[in-house]
Amino acid sequence: MRCLAFVLLLGAMVFPAFPAGELSGRRAPGFTLPDSNVNYHDLADYRGKIILLDIVQTACPVCGSSHRIFETIRQKFPDKVQILSIVVPPDNQNNVRQFIANFAVKTPVLFDCGQMIGSYLKLTPQKSQATFPHLFLIDANGWIRNDWEYKGGQEKYFESLDPVLQEVTALVKEMQAGGAKAAAGPAKPAAKK
């Protein structure tokens, strides 16, 4: 019976319950970015928490409504989840203040010049276009467990909080169980041939 439990646990570690986006399954690149009050936020300061890293533009028609969904998740797990929103030019302090007021944003909105999002979105001279919003789910050990890219249109980014909530809940249970996936992070995808 113990052998079966071990095999099932090992299987859960190798084959995650949720499919990961194409930018997942790797260590989250570190960053230190300022917010609108020029307070700096370092990703390492949030180690031990699950992070919803949302790369947005304030003019985006779906970014504010999705933020309300993420805030609901943060309120459900206040000591375990942190939301960080990242904006890039042409967004500025005035746009961000208005975005914060319009959508009652209670979590940090950080400013990037493009280098941080370039590393997260794996931008290159050949692949230089980015779509916003883009959400990254980072586990307590600093690994990108999943990512979601907005595919366009006027529909909401997330119709409900279910897809993200299910994954966050699974990560919280994993944390409470003592971190079945140790600091080595999630299983790495097989090498492409």
Q: Where do the model's predicted regions map?
A:
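Short hydrophobic alpha-helix segments
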Residues: 44, 121, 146-148
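Short, internal strand/loop/helix patches
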Residues: 100-132, 138
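N-terminal "domain-start" segment that seeds a small globular fold
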Residues: 18-43
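Hydrophobic beta-strand anchors of alpha/beta hydrolase catalytic cores
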Residues: 52-53, 83, 135
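Thiol-/selenol-based redox modules, centered on thioredoxin-like
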Residues: 132-193
